[in-house]
Amino acid sequence: MVVIVGGMIGIGKTTTSKMLGKETGLKVYYESVEGNKVLPLFYTSSKEEKEKYRYPFLLQLSFLRSRFHAIKEALKNDNAIMDRSIYEDYYFAKKNFELGNINEMEMDLYEGLLSEMMDELNLLPKKSPDVMVYLHGSFETVLNRIKERGRSFELDSELVSYYKFLYDGYDEWVHSSYKASPIISIDVDKKDIVYNESDKKEFLEELSKYNKIK
């Protein structure tokens, strides 16, 4: 079974993935944040530095590469919880293109690489995940959780408008463009599937419909 945990920055994907790994015994592939040298530069560099050094494009390539290798291994082994995945990667590239952080030539290159990677995944016996657990909540909740996890490079007040830009289109994109698997939608403002045992039990029962959890 391959389960993707998706949702906005800071919404609780890693915590949920860790819980799912413990409950199901599946291997957890965490988002490649630690050790990513480009990520803090993307958040902290000036507009001029971004334009000169192309940090937004480099970051997307970095994530695309790591997520491709992760989903490829996960699908081959059919035994994984994925903290974010290659399927949502395009959304972030698209939004940064809309903001002008990624130029047209870079976007064309990115889309070509992504298309080739998806073609390669389609050659595998298992071609897609079994289900996506989509975490969503209010924008206030997103901001609070970003602050709570305390990554210094994510906390600049000037980033709020960037987070809002991502947030405003996220839900629509997931429900209109994500086609790789069925979706289990969790409103984190209404349910706590990590720490509330009743909510967790209900969620795991729903998840078990996609594969038997022993």
Whereabouts are the PLM-identified features?
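Hydrophobic positions on the alpha1 helix immediately C-terminal to the Walker A/P-loop
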Residues: 16, 20
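Hydrophobic anchor at the beta1->P-loop junction of P-loop NTPases
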Residues: 5
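P-loop (Walker A) phosphate-binding loop of NTP-binding proteins
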Residues: 8
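NTP-dependent small-molecule kinase module
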Residues: 143-214
